[in-house]
Amino acid sequence: ADSVMFCTSKGLGAPMGSLLCGSKDFIRKAAETRKMLGGNLRQAGFMAAAAEYALRHNIPALAEDHRRARELCGMLQDAQAISIPSVIQSNIIILDITGTRLSPSEFIARLKVRGLWLSESGSSHVRMLLYSGISDEEVRQAACILKEFLSEL
């Protein structure tokens, strides 16, 4: 690929913003297109400063999020009725819940009342996302909540 775009507000924790990287010609064309579509933004320096801070200071925290995701998967390896990915490369875990015979929305609703929030990721999958606001203890609690719920099915 000759270009890449990434969001600074997700794992890096900036309040908003994305970076588009590529050749000077590509960036010039992208800026023109953005302006034509009404996406021009004035006084954006404060957002750029927050994104720059996140790039300079928050990258090490991503490794912690990834570690917690791997640990959570390890805690769930023996859980019933779900399939856990064998390799976790980020802070996102996609669980196959086909074995529960619940729809993703029902699965999510039942866990939400127990204090565990997930999101849908297709017709038979749910997504768990770990971020810097989640502690090691909360990861252990999430595993316990999920395993207890699955044992009751």
Regions found by a protein language model. Name each.
Residues 1-99:
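Active-site C-terminal subdomain of aminotransferase-like
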Residues 9-10, 103, 123:
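Short, ordered loop/turn segments at secondary-structure junctions
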Residues 21-23, 103, 137:
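Short, hinge-like loop/turn segments at secondary-structure boundaries
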Residues 72, 76, 111-114, 146:
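Hydrophobic alpha-helical packing residues
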Residues 82, 117-118:
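A short, conserved structural fragment
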Residues 85-89, 110, 121-123:
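A structural signal for short secondary-structure junctions
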Residues 94-113, 119:
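A C-terminal functional module that forms or caps the active site or interfaces directly
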Residues 106, 114, 124-153:
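PLP-dependent enzyme catalytic core of the Aspartate aminotransferase-like
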